[in-house]
């Protein structure tokens, strides 16, 4: 096999800038070393396969948003010549062109790369993250098939893939590299009953309330359906547990398990100090107080109405854009009935009619949409802060319908 230098250079280039600085010396040495190393050529038979060890590596979560669910890699270790590499399908860079819009639209490309095992462990040790190795009990023929697939994967034209959080990520790629090239079927334990994509990620983002809230807002109806065993393996810990209990060709798939790095105790930061629920209750309380003033005085404040429409419309733009996103489980989202871009279409009309205290059909339209959104919660989980804000907006719509004068009634029109 040929772990070519081009792949390794690409790997170094694609790492975030701080990691590049930390690994710069390591990669220079590695590239020089690999210039004289040749593994087994693609056109020649693979030999000494019995001395090769294939392992699944599972890494514990980190502090960054993209690391909160852990990571998976594959280890290739040739005990005869000492070659020891980690095959990593989770390489990306936030510095690439148009990264943010591409990420929002689900058009982010990830890369597959190879690095020395010592460098891989050094990085995770620096981040205080744990690494567990599961050595696979597979035949020589299985190893040959995996190595052939790896030779194909590592070609420069094959290293890039379109990332999909639930269906095609670093964990599913590592699994497929192994399982899809075994000569016998892997028998996994029974799938988790009633496990949905949303419920599974809640186990990992629960300590980060704003991350959990943001993801719950963006995930739609399809995130709440029951998942299959294969779908449940998008999470590194799930795949590790399944491998541990899997049967292959009459024996355990995993021959032995080793803790290569013990995770360090990390201080978890939940981001913004005020939890989403408290923030929602605070904003809803302000809106309720203003609505009470509206009702008692039978007079609305166009500035507050404008503020609500602009904020909800801006949030609605995000949900509207997600309709066209390639991200899984985001295109069909009932929350768009609560927050959508329609307020911008009615903004000028609302300002004019609120200043004249006239009836505005927008409040009826919005009230109907919000009501339909609450009906949609039967099919989709909606986080409590979003429901609180939606209920607050519904009350605001009702107050307007109660106090606004019909357009035909004007001061001095009666004779």
How should each PLM-predicted stretch be described?
Residues 152-348, 352-362, 366-412:
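Activation targets extended, charge/polar-rich intrinsically disordered C-terminal tails
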Residues 41-45:
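Boundary at the C-terminal end of the N-terminal hydrophobic targeting segment
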Residues 28-37:
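Bacterial N-terminal signal peptides
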Residues 93-168, 172-182:
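A cross-kingdom signal targeting lumenal/periplasmic-facing segments of multi-pass membrane
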Residues 50-129:
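Glycine-rich catalytic cores of cysteine/serine-nucleophile enzymes that process amide/ester linkages
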Residues 3-8, 18-29:
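Bacterial N-terminal signal peptides that target proteins for export
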